[in-house]
Amino acid sequence: MRLDEIKNLNFLVMGLGLNGGGVALSRFLLKHGAKLVITDLKSEAELALSIDSLRDFDDQIRYVLGKHDVNDFKKADIVVKNPSVRPNNKYLKLAKRVETDISLFLIFNKNPIIAVTGTKGKSTLVSLLYQALKKKYPRVKLGGNIGVSPLSFFDQLDGKSPLILELSSWQLQSLENFNPILSIITNVYNDHQNYYSNFDDYIIDKSKIFVNQTSGIVIIQDKAYYKYFSKFESKAKVILFSEFNPCNLDQDIFYSNKGEVYFNDNLIGSFFESQVVFMIPKLIAFFVAYYLNIDLNHMFQILKNFKGIEHRLEFVKLVRNVMFYNDTASTIPDSTVLSVKSLKTNDNCINLIVGGTDKNLDFSSFSKIINLVKAWILIKGSATVKIINVLEKSSIQYFVFDSLRGAVNYAFEISSPGDIVLFSPASASFELFNNEFDRGLQFKKLVDMLG
């Protein structure tokens, strides 16, 4: 399909949503003359912000909201689905052709792609890579799962500067011929088991970041590679990494040892990172800078000055000498465990706010941090029942609240000067919030109200 062919086709956007991806997709199609129908199970009132942002195209759009119409799926030349819609959806079975915003973008894109996936750490890593590359490549772009559809800046691409894409397993699922110049898998934990029938299917989708790569390198954590990805073939050169001394030196590998970074046996630089949760993204970013011949002194300054990104172990405020951290993006237990370990020192106590919607995950890893948490403050939800079971097995006291407001107020009430209140839910957000970002914003507003 060529760009000039869009105007001759009937498109159906399945899932306008509230996070901007559906709007960017719709704008791209409308700008290129598509005949467009937008359908979403949410109501017009729920989608008001997204609909308002498309008002200048009102005469070109037909909306079907609060339901789906089978005839729309039968008539459309191309259905562009939200990545979270499962491929076996009954409506998609009626479609002649199904794409996503990412797969559609890749049809037209000519820029070289650096692709990043992984269960956790993706957004932190792509943010670091973007900062590292923009000095050498002023027209570098960043998009994907970080909240910016690459279709939103398609017309600004020059065909040669690097494009950094953060990709979730759902986004990778539909990509059959994806061929980046450099691909990265930060880590793999159990996640989205409410979406996948088994963990192997999750791994298969993650592997699509590199299986069709024809050149360049793929960077994978050594333990994850040997456990999950060594069975997949690719023409890309595999380079492993380890945040500690490597478990195997038979393949090319970079790793950190007491702040020094080695590639195989060669020292390539050094940096220090005290927070466990930032160690892997910073280590990978440092090596990518080395691999792409980016000034390592420049890279060192970026790593030194990097304070994280919103919603990922984000320092919010100091209130009466109590520190508040927003870690709403921790939607699995392993991520919350890392966050607690990152903040815990001998001089502070952590009051942990946790709980939410279950994703069919195992919370037994919480046993690793039971003795690191001063108070367990739980928000009601389907996942919270599982957390309670883990705590009760260890005879740990906990407090359950019906609202985030109640949890925040109680955490502040019991905190002593020097304590940390960490909001790291280890769960999805859908029972009480629109999404995890809405949840994080509400947490920050509540903290602001404390003083």
UniProtKB/Swiss-Prot annotation:
GO CC field: cytoplasm
Alphabetical GO biological process terms: cell division; cell wall organization; peptidoglycan biosynthetic process; regulation of cell shape
Subcellular location: Cytoplasm
One MF annotation (Gene Ontology) recorded for this entry: ATP binding
Pfam families for the chain: Mur_ligase_C, Mur_ligase_M, MurD-like_N
Keyword NAD part of the UniProt annotation: no
Signal peptide: none
Biological or metabolic pathway of the protein: Cell wall biogenesis; peptidoglycan biosynthesis
SUPFAM superfamilies tied to this protein: MurCD N-terminal domain, MurD-like peptide ligases, catalytic domain, MurD-like peptide ligases, peptide-binding domain
Claim: Cell cycle is one of the keywords in the record: yes
Keyword entries, A-Z: ATP-binding, Cell cycle, Cell division, Cell shape, Cell wall biogenesis/degradation, Cytoplasm, Ligase, Nucleotide-binding, Peptidoglycan synthesis
Top-level taxon: Bacteria
Positions that bind ATP: 118-124
Catalysed reaction equations from the record: UDP-N-acetyl-alpha-D-muramoyl-L-alanine + D-glutamate + ATP = UDP-N-acetyl-alpha-D-muramoyl-L-alanyl-D-glutamate + ADP + phosphate + H(+)
EC number: 6.3.2.9
Biological role: Cell wall formation. Catalyzes the addition of glutamate to the nucleotide precursor UDP-N-acetylmuramoyl-L-alanine (UMA).
Family: Belongs to the MurCDEF family.
Protein name: UDP-N-acetylmuramoylalanine--D-glutamate ligase
Encoding gene, per UniProt annotation: murD
